[in-house]
C-alpha cells in the first residue's frame, strides 16, 4: 500500500471516528489487529457492539468505496470480531457490522454510513 493510500485511509478513519462520536457512539478501540484480520473501529451504539469497516476513496471512478468490502474481507472482519469479543469476554453481546464509505472528491467529503452492512461470515 502506498504512503498516499495509508494517509488517505488514516484521514478517512479519523473522519469516521468524528462522525460516529457526533452520532453518540462510544469508540472502544481503533485498528484492532489479530491473526485473522483487522477491524478499523470498534464502537458501542447503546448496548450493541459495532464493528466498523471504513473505506475511503478520492473519487467514484472505481465505484463506491463500500464495494471494496468483498466477501473475503467480510470473513476477515468477522474472524477479527469474534477474536475481539472473546478477548473482551463478550461473546454473548449483541453485535453488528457497519461500513462507513468516505469519498474525498470536492470541498466536503461525502460520508455514507451503512448500518448492518453484512452478516457474520465464516
Curated annotation (Swiss-Prot):
SUPFAM superfamilies for this protein: Restriction endonuclease-like
InterPro entries assigned to the protein according to its UniProt record, in alphabetical order: Restrct_endonuc-II-like (IPR011335), tRNA_endonuc-like_dom_sf (IPR011856), UPF0102_YraN-like (IPR003509)
Molecular function GO labels: nucleic acid binding
CDD domains for the chain: PoNe_Nuclease (cd20736)
Annotated Pfam families: UPF0102
Database matches in PANTHER family: UPF0102 PROTEIN YRAN (PTHR34039:SF1)
Family: Belongs to the UPF0102 family.
Protein name: UPF0102 protein Gmet_2864
Organism listed in the record: Geobacter metallireducens (strain ATCC 53774 / DSM 7210 / GS-15)
Amino acid at each position: 500500500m502506498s504512503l498516499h493510500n495509508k494517509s488517505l485511509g488514516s484521514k478517512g478513519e479519523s473522519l469516521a471516528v468524528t462522525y460516529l462520536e457526533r452520532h453518540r457512539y462510544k469508540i472502544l478501540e481503533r485498528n484492532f489487529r489479530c491473526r485473522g484480520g483487522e477491524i478499523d473501529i470498534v464502537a458501542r451504539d447503546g448496548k450493541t457492539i459495532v464493528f466498523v469497516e471504513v473505506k475511503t476513496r478520492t473519487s467514484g471512478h472505481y465505484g463506491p468505496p463500500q464495494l471494496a468490502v468483498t466477501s473475503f474481507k467480510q470473513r476477515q472482519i468477522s474472524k477479527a470480531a469474534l477474536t475481539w469479543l472473546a478477548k473482551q469476554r463478550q461473546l454473548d453481546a449483541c453485535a453488528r457490522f457497519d461500513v462507513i464509505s468516505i469519498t474525498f472528491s470536492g470541498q466536503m467529503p461525502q460520508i455514507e454510513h451503512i448500518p448492518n452492512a453484512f452478516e457474520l461470515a465464516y
